[in-house]
Design a protein with these regions (language model features):
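Second-shell loop/turn segments in exported
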Residues: 46-49, 56-57, 107-115, 126-135, ...
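Glycine-rich catalytic cores of cysteine/serine-nucleophile enzymes that process amide/ester linkages
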Residues: 23-24, 35-108
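Activation targets extended, charge/polar-rich intrinsically disordered C-terminal tails
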Residues: 19-26, 124-208
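Bacterial N-terminal signal peptides that target proteins for export
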Residues: 1-6
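Soluble non-cytosolic domains of exported or imported proteins
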Residues: 53, 89-93, 115-120, 134-142, ...
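Acidic helix-start/capping segments at beta-turn-to-alpha-helix junctions
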Residues: 76, 108, 116, 120, ...
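C-terminal motif of bacterial Sec signal peptides marking the signal peptidase cleavage site
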Residues: 13-16
Length: 208
């Protein structure tokens, strides 16, 4: 990494040291367990600034024996999705869409790359995410690349702090498919989490 890049990253990293650990209880994690029924896969989400194309955030959707979202140093959360140190359990299709909707807005697109993998590789990625621990701010790209690097079939993923570099390498993997998510929501998305939580409760009340 160039010295100029390190000079930009290190002050942020040092200021953010001591990531907040979160540990949902066993019963919540067990209750939230979601099996998608889809072939195993790993999906990389990159939040990209529309003006300039800078990668601002990385997250991993791992579809293994259960479907989880590794959202390192992320700010998305939902009351129905228990979290353990940046790993979110119970990622149903609705929650996956909530995650995308939270990040995509008038100033950011969400770029999705999905790669099919064997059940063994998916499970290996899940175990790595479970054991990774809480991630400091500005280390999302670094933690995602840490998890991917060395997985069978992902050897070309570099260890890097930069989400765009992870995305560019991921895009070159065999079988990778791409989708871009656009949204015109205002840049201030502080109310999105409240709306998502409220809409889920309303659906539950209707079903009951």
């Amino acid at each position: 990494m160039r010295r100029s890049a390190l000079a930009l990253i290190l002050p942020i990293a040092l200021a953010a040291c001591g990531a907040e650990p979160v540990w949902a209880p066993d019963e919540a994690v067990t209750r939230a367990r979601f099996i998608s029924g889809q072939p195993p896969s790993i999906t990389l989400y990159t939040v990209v600034r529309k003006n300039g194309g800078t990668g601002e955030h990385s997250g991993l959707l791992i579809d293994a024996s259960q479907r989880v979202m590794f959202d390192p140093a992320g700010t998305w959360h939902h009351p129905w999705v228990p979290e353990r140190n940046d790993l979110h359990y119970g990622i149903t299709e609705k929650m996956r869409k909530f995650y995308i909707d939270y990040h995509a807005r008038e100033t950011y697109d969400v770029i999705e790359y999905r790669v099919p993998v064997s059940p063994e590789v998916a499970e290996m990625a899940l175990r790595r995410a479970e054991s990774y621990g809480a991630v400091n701010k500005a280390f999302c790209g670094n933690s995602v690349s840490d998890i991917l690097t060395g997985l069978p079939g992902f050897e070309t993923i570099p260890r890097t702090f930069f989400p765009n570099k992870v995305m560019q390498a991921f895009a070159e993997l065999p079988g990778a498919t791409m989708k871009v998510h656009h949204d015109g929501d205002p840049d201030n998305n502080s109310g999105v989490l409240l709306v998502q939580a409220k809409s889920t409760v309303e659906i539950q009340n209707i079903n009951n």
